[in-house]
């Protein structure tokens, strides 16, 4: 088996992100992505296993981290004594929401893919992460 050429995966992912943003998952073409990246569809299949694997490689890291932020906020809130939770609910809700919104804007294109371009994937709803 040949060794992957350095920089090709990054080029594929850049071109894939553009194609998925432009056309959504269902209408995106691996041939177009490969041509734009200057490689072959075989190269994409060997690296990612196919279109769904490529889409997952783009969105899964950010989706998992987003979920971890959400869970972390919930866990911190649960550590507050139950009788004091009502006093801190607004603060935790606002701070947690801001953390999640900041993260989404820091990874805006990825969340565009999740919201607008994920139909046909396991990511069609954020809760499938």
Please place each PLM-identified region on the residue numbering.
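Alpha-helical DNA-contacting segments of helix-turn-helix folds
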Residues: 56-65
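Conserved acidic
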Residues: 4, 8, 58, 85-92, ...
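Helix-turn-helix
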Residues: 11, 15, 19-53, 57
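Solvent-exposed, amphipathic alpha-helical segments
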Residues: 15-22, 65-76, 110
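Amphipathic alpha-helical packing segments from all-alpha helical-bundle domains
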Residues: 91, 95-106, 119-129
